[in-house]
């Protein structure tokens, strides 16, 4: 495939493109105009009769294929608006989505998905765009496709799934993303190879460690044989992968370094966090992770380096073309993270990349900063091959905004025409539905209110009856209390009289008896 290994234009080429003295080139073919990202000449060539789906003689690419290949996002938008066929394939069975996945053009891939591109289309080897993104280590492109609902466990003609491709090519970022989305790491291919077999035979130690840490039994995985009777150690020895051989023989997988488990998933982020520039360079240079790799929190290595104030790591990432406007799940850019941790040198370095001040942005399209770059521009997995100046990019944003205004006006006209013809719009239907629901709610509340009023009146009547009954009971109680008091007083008077009578009778008799006994006793003693 043309240009797959091309990492993008160099810094000097971009500086040349930004110079105001750049000469205007006139293109003779629609494919050249698309590769250069010149949407004006593309439009002119099509107006002169060029076919939107014209195939070039050398590579059998359509203009849409070339737009996805070079990252000509505006041209790709224009072609899709104009009706270009997104299902047309090359001689190898690649659609524009396949090429965007290979090149890591995630912005182009998003545009294709929005326009209905079929991500389940397989090429001549049975590979979908998902397989190709995993092969080339474009984890953000992979994530975009997974979020669109594509099957993460689709197989090619060799029964390889995306997880097999990521393991074989040592794409740790893609591998961990696929595992997170539920891809089976214990599935075998047509030769009985597990992903750990493929990682071992290619010497991808980071991927091997990660796979073993996520498998149900690492010991069983190392002992598992493929259809040729080879286990992980056999394959590593046959292909002379000494690092894997030493790892297995040293039994490091059995938990001798439990503190390193976080490093298995995001070693690049850990290196950036620690300021280990050499490890970071090696990981990115070897393709284990890409420059703008996201972790579970959406942070890139630049976020990690900015949070710790590692200026050397930040400078290297910037020189390599890392995107400084990516936001994590908290909505923070690397500059925001540096501010939060008060690393002023990092803040100054990162804010120097911005060509505008946030406070100066206005919603007025006539403002000078309205069409300047305000966020992530284009793809983040891989840089495009275009050499566009800042004015060209601003003009592209102006054209896109103009398209928005035109379509809004057309939509208003179309809605007005529809209403004039007796139709009803979705907005009107929604309003009527809301009105009906409001009316229904009001009626229900009014009925509830009437019921509560009747209930209140009934309760008030019962309350009046209870009050009358209480008054009657109070009167009866008072009468009973008065009668009982009078009776008690009469009883007390009678009892006191009876006591006095008994006292008078008993006292004299008792004295007489005692006197008689004393006299009798004295007579007896004398005798």
From Swiss-Prot:
GO terms for cellular component: nucleus. Residues 1-27 are annotated as: Disordered. InterPro entries: Ank_Repeat/CDKN_Inhibitor, Ankyrin_rpt, Ankyrin_rpt-contain_sf. GO terms for biological process: positive regulation of cytokine production involved in inflammatory response. ANK repeats lie at residues 25-54, 59-88, 92-121, 125-154, 158-187, 191-220, 228-257, 263-293, 297-326, 330-360. One of its GO terms (molecular function) is NF-kappaB binding. It comes from the Eukaryota. The keyword Repeat applies. Residues 395-484 form a coiled coil. Residues 12-21 have a biased composition (Basic and acidic residues). Keywords: ANK repeat, Coiled coil, Repeat. The keyword 4Fe-4S does not apply. Pfam families: Ank_2. This is Ankyrin repeat domain-containing protein 42.
